């Protein structure tokens, strides 16, 4: 009898998901994420995510703008523009809401130092988007896929007692957010660039996601007490 080999997904985005599965599993098992799931994550630790992800999203918006300019068709250019509006008007607004709920003043949110890991992750995405459209897409997709994957997994567990963490899970498992990520993956499928190169970028993107969680978990002392 011939051996039964695992089926190779037809879609590039699914092949790259499969390739990055061990890193995504590590993200789900990370103590920062598990703390959200259980509701036991100290508020001061979660506040790091609120601030650093706020700053990360500022550069993320720039990368969306680059993709909106360099996409090969009008439809894709329009969709990336819509992604920018969604990020600016909804996701950043949600961060403002979380900041208030975690006692982070607006001045602290806007003026807090951007940590080295946040800067490095953002620089990676900017660099890839400047190199080519396909690389920019491959660098950006892992972030959205990562949040949807984590939130869906956490939503399948018992809800955390802390409503703030339950709301975080609801936000990133929301169908509207998932639909936006689905479109991003479909655009990755359509990119006319060499898949091996895109796979390297994609894997690096997932690695940066894992590093970001670890970066937040380790933290920098007295982040909100500087100056």
Which residue ranges define each predicted feature?
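Short, contiguous, pocket-lining structural segments
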Residues: 45-59, 86, 176, 180, ...
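Short alpha-helical hairpin
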Residues: 17-41, 60, 182-192
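Hydrophobic alpha-helical segments
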Residues: 2, 8-9, 16, 121-125, ...
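Hydrophobic/basic alpha-helical segments enriched in Actinobacteria
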Residues: 9-29, 33-36, 72, 172-173, ...
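Carbohydrate-associated surface elements
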Residues: 115-116, 162, 178-192, 205-206, ...
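Acidic, carboxylate-rich catalytic segments that either coordinate divalent cations
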Residues: 198-227
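Active-site-proximal alpha-helical scaffolds that flank and shape metal-associated catalytic sites
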Residues: 5, 51, 75-176, 207
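Alpha-helical bundle segments that constitute or directly flank the non-heme di-iron/ferroxidase center
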Residues: 21-27, 40-70, 89-90, 138-148, ...
